[in-house]
Amino acid sequence: MDNSEVIIRFKGLSFTYHDNQSHRPVLDDLNLQISRGERVGLIGDNGSGKTTLFHLLMGLLRPTAGAIEVFGEERQKEKDFREVREKIGLLFQDSDDQLFCPTVAEDVAFGPLNLGKSQDEALAITREVLERLGLEGFEDRLTYKLSGGEKRLISLATVLAMKPEVLILDEPSTGLDEDTVERLTEILRSSDLTYLIASHNSDFLSKTTDIVYRLGRGKLTRLVS
């Protein structure tokens, strides 16, 4: 693994919402680079721009200024972000934004099927991912009947089933009990994936990441561990 390979780079990134009456940018000339194998944490208050940054990375929003480079290429147009979405898995902050099929198996298998896997291959991936997350036997459970914590883990399963190169996790420990947070921590630490986690939980970030930045007033500040 070549840890010197920069796979995500934000250069002078700025973003302001059109309905922001204060006209203060949510992100202001922000610079960050993440190399392959790095585990990066992002902490900040509500409204500080963590989710906005993730949505910019995935092409769900467009920056007011600056550049986004992913896998060595600048990404500007919708077609530029198609490869990004295939190789980077985003866990949304709200699980209901991620889960839309009647059953757990259908939700988890949706991504692999969309990538061209057969029904049998998608089902095998679904079972493997659910087992890894300690969710054996959840295949036929109705998604809308799951608890908040269970929905969170199923959302993560849908991301992992896509076999991404990079994980972008927006508040992954929210709604999870202590035992489940511990299991999630073990899963992340044992993974060889590059990932970026936004969380209010500084203890969780200290256990799952190697570098932590604070986002505030549109700027990033690296925290000393």
Feature map (PLM): residue ranges:
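Conserved ABC ATPase "signature" region
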Residues: 120-138
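H-loop/switch region of ABC-family ATPase nucleotide-binding domains
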Residues: 199-200
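Helix-to-loop junction immediately C-terminal to a conserved catalytic motif
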Residues: 58
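Conserved ABC ATPase signature
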Residues: 142-146, 150
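Conserved ABC transporter NBD signature motif
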Residues: 66-76, 84
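Catalytic Walker B motif of ABC-type/P-loop ATPase nucleotide-binding domains
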Residues: 167-170
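The feature captures the beta-strand-to-loop junction immediately N-terminal to the Walker
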Residues: 43-45
